Structures are given as structure tokens and as C-alpha cells.
Amino acid sequence: MRAYNFCAGPAALPTAVLEKAQQELLDWQGKGLSIMEMSHRSADYVAVAEKAEADLRKLMNIPENYKVLFLQGGASLQFSAIPLNLLGKNNKADYIHTGIWSEKALKEAKRYGDINVVEAGIKVDGKFAISEQSEWNLSDDAAYVHYADNETIGGLQFAGVPDVKAPLVCDFSSSILSAPLDVSKFGLIYAGAQKNIGPAGLTIVIIRDDLLDQAKAEIPSILKYADQAKNGSMVNTPSTYAWYLSGLVFEWLLEQGGVDAIHKVNLEKAQLLYGYIDSSDFYNNPIAIPNRSIMNVPFTLADEALEKQFLKEAEENHLLNLAGHRSVGGMRASIYNAVPLEGVQALIRFMDDFAKRNG
């Protein structure tokens, strides 16, 4: 049987997608070869790539004045690529700091420009939260404002989209496609694929056309968004299999009814899990309710000494990858689009049984 996988990334993929990939692995659509063996310049592969982009545009209602790039190097490479591409004419940017991933982004950006750090992570009644925008010290002349919508490690998520004058740049790695989004509010959106899009090895960048000419002169051409846009994300050989698999995930999402439909399921999963944790004396979630992530749910046990036992027994019950990130400890259930409601129900049953036996 397939276990329920709560890994933060690389994360669960829909079973139907894996089955289709398995079916097509040796002989893609009667062509006598695997898509992994196919030239990225072939008409067949270009059609696969173009369909994946078209389906993503449909899922996210991406306006025509935005380019969609399928890149490599993970979201972490974009921590450098973004300032290199967007600070060519104005060397200043604002970075909103709410946790570990937004901190990694701003540390890289500081190597390339004058970065104003907006400290927005706060504590409210002992719980982690994000401060009101009225309290942020934003610059008047920033080239862009950067934030991470969902701090995957901390389980801290923005309750809405910040309203700023400068182009808004956002890391959506762990929340893309989980809820409806107005792409037109952003200058640039980026996301590593290995959480809600597909397997590791692919990074999506969605950039507004007017930002394609802002790059620093010395930027490597492989990192230059304008060059990638001009070459259909194929300045060099792309991650062909990851791109194909992501396309299958987009097809699957459309079959589920699109982002609106999957968002309803995601809310149900999150409400069930948080509801159980809040009703329990044995488990605790450290995040203020308005800023709780619907994708990454961290929690601690009443007795830290029981953590190893909890993880061992969870695995015996086919509930995998529930350990929190090494930097914060505790537990974390990542309940991305591909984690079914039944998986969350099974997790809650196990948590309840464990609490009764050890509380």
C-alpha cells in the first residue's frame, strides 16, 4: 500500500499522476522511447512543454502580459537571480522578514544591492504572527518589495497580499496552487516545484513583461529572465522530466475542478487538523490563528521526550515524514494538494490514540 506522505518537500504527488507516468515511462504515447530520452527541441517535447504552460496559465488565470518560465536551480537560485534581474536600474529593494526562508532570500539580495529589511515577524500572546502593514518601514523608492507568502518551516502564512506601490515579488514555493491568487497584483512570482507543482529540479517564475529589461549588465545569460523568455525557457537543456511531470499535475488539478475546488479541500484538511490540535491538551501549534499556514502545520507534544516514539509509531502506521525541520524541531504535517483528506483523518486518529496512551 502507498503510505500517507507529509514531507515538506520533495512532497507527495497525486497517485493518478504517478500511475500515468509509470504507464508512459518506457514508451511515451507509442513513440518507442521514454520522454526522459527525448530531445527537448523535438516537436513532441515542445508540445508537452507548451501544454504544461497553457494549463498553468488556465489554473492561475495568468494575464497575457506575464511570461511563465520553467527554470532550474530551485527557489534558492532565484534568491540571487531576482536582485540580478530587477536591480539593474534602481539598486534598492525592500525585503519583508518573517522567517527562515525570507531571511535566506534577503541575505543573498544584500550581495547585489541596498536592501531595506522590514521586520514583520512578531509574537502575539506567545504565538508567532505577522505584523500589520501599517507598522512596516517600507521605502519610497524601492525597485521591488519581496516577501515569502508561506514560511514552510515555521508554518507562518500571510493572511492577504500586501498592498504596496513598488512591484511585488513573492516566494510562493509552498503555497502556489493551494488557493486562488490574483497574479496581476504581482511583478514576479516564483516557486520551487517540489511541494505543490511536481518533483524537485524545476522552478517556476511568472514575471510581468515590463520587468524584463531591469537586469544588471553583468548577469549570466542563463539567469537572465529576458533571455529565458525569448528562448522558451530553453537557453540550455531544461529539466525535461520534471517539466513533463508537472504538466501531469496541472492536468490532474484541472480534473479536480481547478484551484477553487482544491482550495476547498485544503481548507477542510487544515481546519480538521488545527481543530484537533486546539482541542487537545497534548498537542500545541505555535502560530497565531490569522497567520496559520493551510499547507504546513507545525505542532509540539506535551512531552518532548516522546517525539522519537511518536515518529516511530507514526511510520508503523504508514504516516511518513512528520518530523519538524532540524532548525526548529517538533513535528510538522505538510498537507499539500496531493495529500488526501483521508490522510489527514488517518493522522488525527493516530495522534488521538497516541495522546490517550501517553498523556
Curated annotation (Swiss-Prot):
**Where along this sequence does the record place binding of pyridoxal 5'-phosphate?**
75-76, 101, 152, 171, 194, 236-237
- Spell out the SUPFAM superfamilies in the cross-references: PLP-dependent transferases
Q: CDD domains of this UniProt entry? A: PSAT_like (cd00611)
Q: Which Pfam families is this protein grouped with?
A: Aminotran_5 (PF00266)
**Listed GO biological process terms:** L-serine biosynthetic process; pyridoxine biosynthetic process
EC assignment: 2.6.1.52
Superkingdom of the source? Bacteria
* Needed co-factor(s): pyridoxal 5'-phosphate
Q: In which pathway does it act?
A: Amino-acid biosynthesis; L-serine biosynthesis; L-serine from 3-phospho-D-glycerate: step 2/3; Cofactor biosynthesis; pyridoxine 5'-phosphate biosynthesis; pyridoxine 5'-phosphate from D-erythrose 4-phosphate: step 3/5
Q: Which residues are recorded as binding L-glutamate?
A: 41
Q: Which GO terms describe its molecular function?
A: O-phospho-L-serine:2-oxoglutarate aminotransferase activity; pyridoxal phosphate binding
Show the Gene3D superfamilies listed in the entry.
Answer: Aspartate Aminotransferase, domain 1 (3.90.1150.10), Type I PLP-dependent aspartate aminotransferase-like (Major domain) (3.40.640.10)
State the reactions this protein catalyses.
O-phospho-L-serine + 2-oxoglutarate = 3-phosphooxypyruvate + L-glutamate; 4-(phosphooxy)-L-threonine + 2-oxoglutarate = (R)-3-hydroxy-2-oxo-4-phosphooxybutanoate + L-glutamate
Q: Which family does it belong to?
A: Belongs to the class-V pyridoxal-phosphate-dependent aminotransferase family. SerC subfamily.
Q: How does it assemble?
A: Homodimer.
Q: In its UniProt entry, what is this protein called?
A: Phosphoserine aminotransferase
Organism, as annotated = Acinetobacter baumannii (strain ACICU)
